[in-house]
């Protein structure tokens, strides 16, 4: 889990636009965040396996 202070800091608008970055909307993780969903790979996998994201399923071939 991310620190509450870091989540609050990331929510503020940065002084320069290049300093902005995405965070997971669920857990606050700063890395490997999918822009389409707004969540990180860990939360995406968990939610996809539980069937909470419509149209997304585990690949099998």
Swiss-Prot record:
InterPro entries: Ribosomal_uS14, Ribosomal_uS14_bact, Ribosomal_uS14_CS, Ribosomal_uS14_sf. Zn(2+) binds at residues 24, 27, 40, 43. Keywords: Metal-binding, Ribonucleoprotein, Ribosomal protein, RNA-binding, rRNA-binding, Zinc. GO terms for molecular function: rRNA binding; structural constituent of ribosome; zinc ion binding. One of its GO terms (cellular component) is cytoplasm. It comes from the Bacteria. Its cofactor is Zn(2+). One of its GO terms (biological process) is translation. It holds the Pfam family Ribosomal_S14. SUPFAM superfamilies: Glucocorticoid receptor-like (DNA-binding domain). The keyword Metal-binding applies. Belongs to the universal ribosomal protein uS14 family. Zinc-binding uS14 subfamily. Part of the 30S ribosomal subunit. Contacts proteins S3 and S10. PANTHER family: 30S RIBOSOMAL PROTEIN S14, SMALL RIBOSOMAL SUBUNIT PROTEIN US14M. Binds 16S rRNA, required for the assembly of 30S particles and may also be responsible for determining the conformation of the 16S rRNA at the A site. This is Small ribosomal subunit protein uS14. It comes from Campylobacter fetus subsp. fetus (strain 82-40).
